[in-house]
A protein has these predicted regions:
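Catalytic domains of carbohydrate-active enzymes, especially glycoside hydrolases
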Residues: 54-73, 142
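Glycine-rich, proline-tolerant flexible connector loops at the mouths of alpha/beta enzymes
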Residues: 69-94, 150-154
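Acidic/histidine-rich catalytic cores of soluble enzymes
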Residues: 67-68, 164-267
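Active-site acidic/histidine proton-transfer and metal-coordination neighborhood
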Residues: 10-17, 61, 91-210, 216, ...
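N-terminal export signals
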Residues: 4-26
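C-terminal segment of N-terminal export signals and the immediately downstream linker at the start
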Residues: 21-51
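Short, acidic/polar
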Residues: 47-60, 125-136, 226-234, 262
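Hydrophobic faces of well-ordered beta-strands that scaffold small-molecule active sites
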Residues: 33-39, 68-70, 105-110, 146-148, ...
Length: 304
């Protein structure tokens, strides 16, 4: 179903007293924002072997956080868990542990599975196949959303066309999961460019994951040559959002994030009518990972 038809049926739903989210397969959230934990917040501990990726649900519960966002690379590139276990066995074990601790498997972030925006058709189709395997994995976990990246092309027009093709295929592959793109470097960190891709795909389960901090178009966040305005970017991406990432780096003595105006960001999120999870993604170097997660959680709790 495309967005135009969704809008028509959403309007119709008002006559029978139902919200669009009660008609379609949108998450059945309470009427407020909820806090989840992105696994990347714990990437240092996992890479160092101090925390097993299998214990993510347990760790999240220790913070009093009931929703989790997996990162595929922490089971492949940065650990050997997937070498030891098949994808089926890994998903079974993660699902069991999340159920044991009463944790919602919110989404999974997919990295390193090929260039979905490549102009090399063979390469792009291979990337699509790789991501389809992870869609199956995510569905088995009960995730409502899968996040992917749009890499592989430096020409904007070609990047846009290739991205639309790949996203359309993956969104149609299984309508029971949201396929979303995060602003994650390159053209995707330009809110206008990524919103244009979404407009062209026009499929209801295809959308965005606006990240409060990932708006560096050239370079890295700590050494960036070209920043896109993060508040403008989040505002442009929120109409398509199926998830939101609360990036954080450093906090002052009052508990406020020093690089991002969190109140302004949360106001943008609320104004868009978003009712889902907001995922903590701490990437700072001053506080420990645990301390950064707690600080971000406290700040979000004040604002949501």
């Amino acid at each position: 179903m495309n967005r135009r038809n969704f809008s028509k049926l959403a309007a119709l739903s008002s006559f029978v007293g139902l919200a669009p989210s009660q008609i379609f397969s949108s998450p059945n959230y309470d009427d407020h924002l909820k806090i989840s934990l992105a696994q990347w917040s714990l990437n240092k501990a996992i890479k160092a072997g101090q925390l097993s990726g299998l214990d993510f649900a347990k760790k999240s519960r220790s913070f009093g956080i009931e929703g989790i966002e997996y990162v595929s690379g922490l089971y492949t590139t940065h650990s050997n868990l997937l070498e030891k276990m098949s994808m089926n066995k890994l998903s079974d074990e993660l699902l069991k542990r999340s159920n044991d601790y009463g944790i919602d498997n919110v989404l999974i972030m997919i990295d390193g599975q090929g260039n979905l925006a490549s102009s090399n058709k063979k390469e792009r189709l291979e990337a699509i196949d790789n991501h389809m395997r992870w869609i199956d994995f995510a569905l088995k976990l009960g995730c409502e959303t899968l996040r992917l990246n749009l890499n592989g092309e430096k020409n904007l027009d070609k990047w846009t066309d290739n991205s639309v093709k790949s996203l359309s295929t993956l969104s149609e592959y299984n309508k029971n999961i949201n396929v979303v793109v995060e602003n994650h470097g390159g053209f995707s960190s330009n809110g206008k460019y990524l919103a244009n891709v979404m407009s062209n795909v026009d499929i209801i389960n295809c959308g965005t994951l606006p990240d409060f901090g990932n708006f560096c178009m050239d370079g890295s966040p700590r050494n960036c040559n070209n920043w896109y305005d993060k508040y403008k970017g989040v505002e442009e991406l929120m109409p398509y959002a199926h998830a939101v990432s609360a990036k954080s780096y450093h906090f002052d003595e009052n508990g406020d994030e020093t690089t991002i105006d969190y109140k302004k960001m949360i106001d943008i999120v609320k104004k868009a009518g978003y009712k889902g999870y907001v995922g903590i993604e701490y990437e700072g170097n001053i506080l420990s990972e645990d301390e950064g997660i707690v600080a971000t959680k406290k700040l979000l709790e004040k604002l949501i």
